[in-house]
């Protein structure tokens, strides 16, 4: 039997902990316009996006070095950095990279304004992640994209790709539909990734729920690849 009464009667300690938070973050943080719009107008979508990163975080080890391709305004990379050794986030959008740098104070995250195809980092990463990126590329460019990602992956590393399913396209926002060049059926995505990794494991996602149910009923896919070719 746990007596919860012994834990909740120290108001002085509680107030000290609250004050410590306000001292550490006196001005809070200013989110990017994209996230501000989600919070004010579609907060469910904001939490679904975070749930995608939660799933990826569960795949990480504390010793992992992670490259996030398409890190945007940085929330996801900061999320992952709380579950691994270090995260390098890259994005071609300089405005979003500056937004990420503006809110981040974590020492184990770096943000770089860089095109993946021009990335010259010599180190290899334990995990390479790209969520909501491949659907913005043509099929030909997607091949180059996966090849570039695996070139930065350690031999025993893990590649994680997340993307909306083609079956979700009619229900996507106007912004998403305007920018999604190629959405995938799961077997198609598995075949594509199988050209670059030895083994793949697929998951489906609806709202915050990740599962292995019928892929045509899923709104989102994760494919995890192991053993680069």
Regions from the PLM with identified roles:
Residues 161-182:
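Short, glycine-/aromatic-enriched active-site segment of Class I SAM-dependent methyltransferases
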Residues 60, 193-194:
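Hydrophobic C-terminal alpha-helix "anchor/cap" residues
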Residues 165, 199-204:
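Acidic catalytic patch
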Residues 56, 133, 198-200:
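Generic structural signal for conserved hydrophobic packing positions in ordered secondary structure
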Residues 153-159:
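Short glycine-dipeptide loop
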Residues 136-137:
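A short His-aromatic
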Residues 127-133:
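A short beta-strand submotif of the Rossmann-like class I SAM-dependent methyltransferase core
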Residues 1-123, 127, 140-147, 152, ...:
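Conserved N-terminal segment of class I S-adenosyl-L-methionine
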